[in-house]
């Protein structure tokens, strides 16, 4: 990059952590009813968007890290799909232990797969809808939570099965239909703060055109007093990048 080049986007790794923590918080808050068959195992299934996509990899790792089911491979949490994992012996994940109110539960990733259709398209909502049908036939009431790398796949699974069976489903992107579905039992989603990304983009451009410091109106107030709060963005000087921070959208704040 030259000295006048900057990047604006969202923090994928921070967003992945937000999604994982959102799922864990929901489980802990609803521990008295989350275990549908009472077997002491909190089972979840995971819809993976694209096994080679950075955002998909980050989100899979974020969920597994938060729930304790991740295993390391080459210094990072393994993000590969497990296929089915009925007995908890899949190499890609591990059973985790979660203690809430003095009681211990096993957390298990029952199944995960890349949602790729026959034409090769990834992040495919229809494939996710079919997958939840297969998983529900295989696992039944062992599925306590449904997690997806995005809302497109998440809503497909929610509408196909989770909603009628009252199983919390979590996605990512804060799509309007997903946010609206929270009132119907959708567990939650993650906002990438598109408004902050848009403001950052326009502000960096405006500052460049005006010949003022790039941080004007972002980290330092402009003449009109415009400035962003530190909880909605971060700046990486090494990467010359502005990142909007992600936020959980749940029944508590939607």
Range-by-range predicted roles:
Residues 1-254:
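A residue-level marker of the well-folded mature domains of exported/periplasmic proteins
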